[in-house]
Amino acid sequence: MIRKVAGVFLLMLALAGCGKERMVIPNVPVNFSALLTDPRLLKLSSPGGGVVLTGYGVAGLVIYRTTNGNYVAYDRCSTVNPEKQCAVVLDDPTFTVTDPCSGAKFLLEDGTPVKAPAELSLKKYDVFISGNTLQVRN
């Protein structure tokens, strides 16, 4: 009898562990570097400015200058169904980005979701300033 109860318990435990598996944004090498005077980065000259770049990360990069003057960078790949690699787009004003596939929104200050169905923050990359050069790496 104890074996049957233990068997049922183990089966229930195994089934409870089965659920929708969350997809994650793959880790790919990112190594972007440009002078802050580069025309592509012009909108980063003041806090609240953001730019998008293609050809880096999974779906491109979004780089944002926070209200306190720091720089942050995220992969443009939305965390909602990341297997679709839907690239978020900058909103106007550029405090948020929107996933055009799901309608989810993310705050650029820290990458957190602000509109469903997003539950996970955007994938963040490291940003370094060396002299007049901005570098984004992972």
Can you describe what each PLM-predicted range is?
Residues 69, 101-102:
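Short loop/turn microsegments at loop-to-beta-strand junctions
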